Amino acid sequence: DQASLLDEMPAKVASRLLQGLPYSQRRVTSGLLGYPAESAGRLMVPTPTVLTPDTTREEALEKLQSRAKRYAAGPHHSIALATVAVTDESRKLLGMLELADLVTAPEGTLVGELLGEEQHSVSAYDDQEHAARLIQEADLLALPVVDDEDRILGVITVDDAMEVLEAEVTEDAYRAGGAEPLNEPYLTATVMTLAKKRGVWLIVLILAAFLTINVMQYFEDVLEAVVVLSIFVPMLIGTGGNAGSQAASSVVRALAVNEVRPRDVLRVIGREVRVGFLLGVFLGTVIFPILAFLYYPQVAFTISLTIVAICTWACIVGGVLPLVAKKLGVDPAVFSTPVVSTLVDATGLIIYFSIAGVIMADQIRQATGG
């Protein structure tokens, strides 16, 4: 907690406060600050309870009782009591035990006999989110952090892991909406801060929207020849944007929980092609009779076929962009709703007018005198 607090302060202030700490605390805090930001090393509690395999159950409980009295007022009191690291004489990690394992063990049982086969650990240089996800997936109270030789350095507690996951969810939610995450509560942030956090992406998106305008200008002759086509532009680009955003959200979430990786791009494309095609066929089938009744079959067929093509394309774009972002080291959440929608808007119009140009070619030629 001291390391986290100092990390958020200006360098000069943090340095003065660090020098004011007792030597033992200063040494521990300096060690934590030596690890990269967002690393597991920055998040760990560097004073875990450590036992050797030949420690008896009674000796272990006695040590935990003594430690509980020493850290009764500490922020990680409950975790210090609930988890124990088992190491050899060189502090090489052998496994972790929970208090329940010791309490329920028969008298005289050695700690080493209680270790299970499945054990988890992370490097001090691993990403904090990776460590937090591991704690969540394995349902751990604490996750050991080790060095290159598997010697224990500390533990990451479940409460700290949940804070990391909450922060990641908040960050993804902001970026999915096209805004930078806030570093302070919403009601305490100034209006200028809120505007700055949102304005950057709005500028990017409004510049990207010029692609859509250029496409409309390029196909101006088609629109003038068949004016009815312009009526369906909002519906088509809206459908494509929504389909792409849904695909992006699914893949971003899958990346966050390590269900997919950038190398799975072909598998993702294969799945999204099928999903997009099925969605397009379903939507096209629903609207075809309505459009045929209100307008005429050529228009109905053009719009229905365009929806199939746009939904398929939008799902591919929405599925692939987060994988590309991850490969480039960019937060995949950036390529969620706003970016995908803007890109699909422009490319969707190209698909629409290209299909219309083929199906309604005779009508366009007659209208233009070609």
Show where each model-derived region lies.
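Cytosolic regulatory modules rich in charged/polar residues
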Residues: 1-231
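A short hydrophobic/aromatic micro-motif that marks alpha-helical segments and, especially, helix-coil
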Residues: 25, 71, 122, 259, ...
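Alpha-helix N-cap/helix-start motif at coil-to-helix transitions, marked by capping-box chemistry
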Residues: 27-30, 34, 242-245, 315
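Short, highly charged low-complexity linear segments
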Residues: 74, 121-129, 270-271, 342-350
